[in-house]
Amino acid sequence: MTFTFTALLCLGLTLRLWIPVLTGSLPKPILRVQPDSVVSMGTKVTFVCEETIGVKESHLYRNGNLQRTVLKNHQKPTNKTEFSFSNVDQQMQQYQCSYRTQTKSSDYSEPLELVVTGAYSKPSLSAQTNPVVTSGGYVTLKCEPSQDNHTLILTVEGSQKHSWRKDPECNRYTEKCHALFYVGPLTSNQRWIFRCYSYEKHTPQVWSAPSEPVELLVSGKLQKTTIKAEPGSVIRSGRAMTIWCQGDLDAEIYFLHKEGSHNTQSTQTLQQPGNKAKFLIPSVTQRHAGQYRCYCYSSAGWSEPSDTLELVVTGIYYYGVKLSGLPSPVVPEGGNVTLHCTSHSNYDKFILTKEDQKFTSSLDAEYIPSTGQHQALFVMGPMTPNYSGTFRCYGYYKHTPQLWSVPSELLKIFISGPSRKPSLLSHQGHILEPGMSLTLQCYSDTKYDKFALYKEGGTDIIESFSQWTKAGLSMTNFTLSVMPNSTVHSGENVTLMCWSTYSVDTFILSKEGSGQPPLRLKSKIQDQQYQSEFSMSGVTSKLSGTYRCYGSHDSSLYLKALIGVSVAFLLFLFILIFILLRRRHQEKFRKDDEDAQKGKELQLSTGAAEPVTRDRGHQKRSNPAAATQEESLYASVEDMETKDGVELDTWKPPEGDPQGETYAQVEPSRLRRAGAISPVVSREQLNTKYEQAEEGQEVDSQATESEEPQDVTYAQLCSRTLRQGTAAPPLSQAGEAPEEPSVYAALATARPGAVPKNKKQ
């Protein structure tokens, strides 16, 4: 009976599947795609056409055209057919499938759009508000395309896919476009990861590359996570630190979020469920400063946010801060102490921290005009042993409360209690020579672990572990060495230490007045400062003197500056040399032109066969001394003619010639020096020889004397000065130069007025 019922049931189910075929109505197939309907270019995709059993062949269409046909195997009937493509392109793609039985064909499936991404550059996506929302809240996301005239689409990852499309709005002034998507409500039972794409309107299946993902953190109701920083929340710039988040045992992923940021700071996905995640920052910078919270997500949903971790970065400002204890860093129990924090920088606030970071206090800075410093006074008391410890002071500005200055020097506060006081003695006496080493011994019959040595009025306290003696005493020795004393005995060793609270790469130690090159050492960071130690062993008198220490940054920067200065100096030197050479060249050409002009004038004067005239103009002499000079000149020329037997052949200019120069050739004779010429010729004789001279003009003459006797001498009477020179002799008609040069004296007349014959000299 049971077997019969089972057989009838199977027969009924089989007939049910074949009823549509027999009646002529084939069911419409369903088309799906794997891995997703949105894939990047070059991705392998597989289309799955779900159909009925007994299909003879299946067909896949792309954009209405038959793409592929698959013949079915009747021996292994299935209700699915797969079509695989190894490399999809960026063409517009819309797919459908259908199937055919022995007698009929089915209808087409519903269209399936395959979207290909990566055709354009990616847009940018950001959250306009805090990406951390409560369950049921809304968030505004801003998408900016990288291409103009593109439509924007916002998608969310996950099993329930949603998308939003918008045309961007453009600012005509900035020419930037964007679209705002208001998404929600957001629930705490899933992750919300958004991406943005852009596409052209005529190709809606071809998208750009996806934007960077933006994940919204939903504050849930699961157990709150915890957060802590190692080595601490106050850390110096450039050092490494680790932030730990701890939550539920089933947590799959942890999120670290910085308050005020529009994106998730960091994400840590666990390989296996656990309750702790590690976020490492290799080198802390000022951008890491701020407030942080942790979240975790599991299959049950989101956790509550952790408490706030405030990360402070120190060493951002290099202006030093000084900390001191008033009246003394050693305070009796129950007493008060004032910690004085000062700086020359105009910080808005000072903050005092304890080494274990269990104590922090901040005060507004106060300006002191008398010292030109800013200060803050931290009053502590009544003092208890809990207040003892090491303190530091920092300065910062109000607009950046998580960015602090370099720290002050450590200040240790001691609380003197009711225990028995120790004893202090010196075996070397109380009077010492300068530079000697001093050993102070501190001891007590109480079993103390440490002793501290303090100088009255000072700020430095030296600590040392105690030793136990057989007599039951605890004791220790404090040795005050030569360092930092500047008095050293010959043969001893000394160490000079250069240090700075500012960043220094290399320290340079130089001795004043020494010709030796300075010493250089790379700096080392110790006790929150940069320092280098220059050791000298077996010092002698040659090493005595005054030393100075300098700090420098990377030498390559100074090398570049030195090269730049050298190049500029050489360029300036080349330009200066060029200007000097050019000026010298111009002066040489100017001198050559002047010499050529003078030679041309000399050739014209010596080679003229006819009188050569020059327009000197009429010059009148009203000075009696000038008239006397004229008489001497006339007398000198006449004396040359009468005493030395020199014959003058004169050429007078034509009557119409406006120029009054006359050239006279002197027959071969010896020309006497000017001192041998006797001015005894009367004005009447000169006036008789030059009857055509006009009144009111002066006559100047210049005699030229050659060291060697000359055969031919020219004399020109000039109206100004007596010139002397040697002219190049004119060429003969045959082109040959005369055998000897000629010496001439230009005696040019300026047509003086007639001298009365009856005038006495």
From Swiss-Prot:
Give start-end ranges for motif ITIM motif 2: 712-717
Q: Which SMART domains match?
A: IG (SM00409), IGc2 (SM00408)
- Quote one Gene Ontology molecular function term: inhibitory MHC class I receptor activity
Query: Which lineage?
Result: Eukaryota, Metazoa, Chordata, Craniata, Vertebrata
The keyword Cell membrane is assigned to this record: yes
Region annotated Disordered sits at 589-634, 647-668, 684-761
Q: In which tissues is it expressed?
A: Detected in spleen, bone marrow, thymus, ovary and lung.
One biological process term in Gene Ontology:
cytokine-mediated signaling pathway
Name of the protein in its database record: Leukocyte immunoglobulin-like receptor subfamily B member 3-like
Q: Report the principal subcellular site.
A: membrane
**Organism of derivation:** Rattus norvegicus
Q: Where is this motif: ITIM motif 3?
A: 742-747
